[in-house]
Regions:
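A glycine-rich dinucleotide-binding beta-alpha-beta segment and adjacent secondary-structure elements
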Residues: 54-66, 283-347
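Single conserved hydrophobic/aromatic residue that forms the stacking wall/gate
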Residues: 1-13
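A conserved FAD-binding loop/helix module that cradles the flavin
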Residues: 343-364
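Helical element adjacent to the flavin cofactor pocket in flavoenzyme catalytic cores
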Residues: 79-130
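Active-site-adjacent segment of FAD-dependent monooxygenases/related oxidoreductases
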Residues: 27-70
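C-terminal segments that line or cap access tunnels to active or ligand-binding sites in enzymes
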Residues: 191-298
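Mid-domain catalytic core of redox enzymes
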Residues: 91, 121-235
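Active-site-proximal substrate-binding core of FAD-dependent oxidoreductases
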Residues: 125, 366-379
């Protein structure tokens, strides 16, 4: 068992290290990476190198981090994300919003300005380039370069120009999406729930796979439970979250309604799902209910309305070995000064946001310059 696990670890490390983006070693191309591991599924590779069936399931126990699907998600996605988490900090003290705050502070320090509560309603183009963005259907903000981290489908909806070919729009609109999520955000009673410095992945069946395929009776088939890292050293958690897969179809009837105004039936639906998820958590952590002061929830509709991600998906576009290049979204567009970034152009989740940013910025500053700056900042 030990040698099998080591084989999986070494294979993941080799694939991650072969990428100049993940290793921050500049190379003209990542030819070794464009091989079988982008074309073979996670389960196919693991079943090949892991002989113990229980160990094979353990190694993919954190599937909710990237919503992998059996026979579809490439092993390279698993390798990059696992290597990223193995090498990085696993929690952000005080919550992840501190990352956004630090980014805003940096932008301000360099003379930039961050505008909030101003919705971009159109990317304005002339015959050859993007010339600015329209905000709230009125104000025009001139731009030399436009970078969009919105879902690619949302970005295309902002473009009324012949510079984007209909074939490209059709291809982007037909890329499958990852599954949505139902979250229960927990507020614990003070000094009641011991802080967990790890994520907990719970499953009601004997496999982490196929949790996105459920019925009303079988939901939830799996869940992720974690505590948010407190700002001060304390043995107790103040907040946490439970996350389980949820298809957009479950909340489709309320699509088009406004947040906070979806009606009592929607509130009853969320409460029923939350209570069921809490019942499952109680089975894994007996007594946890007594430590919860209150909770609130989110559904795929929440993701759709607040982030614009298609279908309320957690991680945007799905990676599918069956699609090949048709399932990839480039950072460049046919509009020379319009770029895409974020989790849809490279990888999923937090890793996708980080590497998507590097890939897009490399178009403006070169990859070599970006890698050198990152390395210097880490010295």
């Amino acid at each position: 068992m030990r040698s099998s696990a080591a084989s999986d670890v070494y294979k993941r490390q080799d694939i991650a290290n072969a990428s100049s983006l993940h290793s921050l070693r500049y190379a003209d191309s990542d030819a070794p990476l464009n091989t079988e591991y982008q074309l073979r599924s996670i389960n196919a590779v693991i079943d090949e190198v892991i002989t113990d069936p229980v160990l094979a399931k353990v190694l993919v126990g954190n599937l909710p981090l990237y919503a992998a699907e059996k026979d579809k998600t490439p092993f390279s996605t698993h390798a990059f994300i696992m290597d990223f988490y193995n090498q990085s900090a696993f929690r952000v003290r005080g919550g992840s919003d501190s990352i956004a705050t630090a980014l805003v502070d940096t932008i301000n320090r360099y003379g930039g300005e961050v505008l909030t509560r101003q919705k971009v309603t159109r990317i304005v183009c002339d015959d050859t380039h993007a010339v600015g963005v329209e905000v709230d259907g009125g104000e025009m903000l001139p731009c030399d370069i436009v970078i969009s981290d919105a879902h690619p489908m949302r970005t295309l909806e902002l473009l009324d120009t012949r510079l984007i070919r209909p074939a490209f729009r059709r291809r982007i609109n037909h890329i499958p999406q990852t599954v949505g999520g139902f979250s229960v955000y927990l507020h614990f009673k003070e000094n009641t729930v011991p802080y967990l410095n790890y994520n907990y992945y719970g499953y009601q069946g004997d496999t982490p796979w196929d949790c996105e395929r459920y019925t009303e009776q079988s939901w939830p088939k799996g869940f992720l439970y974690m505590h948010f890292c407190p700002e001060t050293d304390t043995p107790y958690a103040s907040t946490g979250v439970i996350l389980s897969y949820m298809q957009m179809a479950d909340v489709e009837q309320w699509k088009g309604t406004a947040p906070g105004r979806r009606g009592q039936a929607y509130e009853d639906f969320k409460r029923r799902k939350a209570e069921r998820l809490l019942d499952v958590l109680e089975e894994h952590f007996p007594g946890i209910r007594s430590g919860i002061q209150n909770y609130y929830t989110s559904t795929p509709l929440t993701y759709l309305d607040y982030t614009g991600t298609e279908g309320g998906s957690m991680y945007g576009n799905a990676r599918d070995i069956g699609l090949g290049s048709a399932g990839r979204v480039p950072q460049r567009t046919r509009i020379p000064n319009l770029y895409l970034t974020g989790q849809n152009i490279n990888s999923h989740g937090m890793l996708g946001v980080l590497v998507g940013t590097v890939v897009t910025c490399s178009e403006l500053l070169t990859a070599k310059t970006i890698y050198e700056q990152i390395k210097k900042a880490g010295e």
